[in-house]
Curated annotation (Swiss-Prot):
Designated name of the protein: Heat-stable enterotoxin ST-IA/ST-P
Family classification: Belongs to the heat-stable enterotoxin family.
Disulfide feature: C59-C64, C60-C68, C63-C71
Organism listed in the record: Escherichia coli
Endpoints of the signal sequence: 1-19
Highest classification ranks of the organism: Bacteria, Pseudomonadati, Pseudomonadota, Gammaproteobacteria, Enterobacterales
Family matches, as InterPro entries: Heat-stable_enterotox_CS (IPR019806), Heat-stable_enterotox_STa (IPR001489)
Length: 72
């Protein structure tokens, strides 16, 4: 009976969700970097304002990432 309980105990400890992790989980040491991408499709040309707006919307659809800069 003791051998059976020991075998069950060891098998339960072998699962990663039940066993204790030896690594420290200090999140303050991890650095998070955010990337921002500049939208290059839009050109600063006052003559083609409607075309620039279409290009801006097209850029936003391409970018799809809220971290992208340059979308209005």
């Amino acid at each position: 009976m003791k051998k059976l309980m020991l075998a069950i105990f060891i098998s339960v400890l072998s699962f990663p969700s039940f066993s204790q992790s030896t690594e420290s989980l200090d999140s303050s040491k991890e650095k998070i970097t955010l990337e921002t991408k500049k939208c290059d499709v839009v050109k600063n040309n006052s003559e083609k304002k409607s075309e620039n707006m279409n290009n801006t919307f097209y850029c936003c659809e391409l970018c799809c990432n809220p971290a992208c800069a340059g979308c209005y």
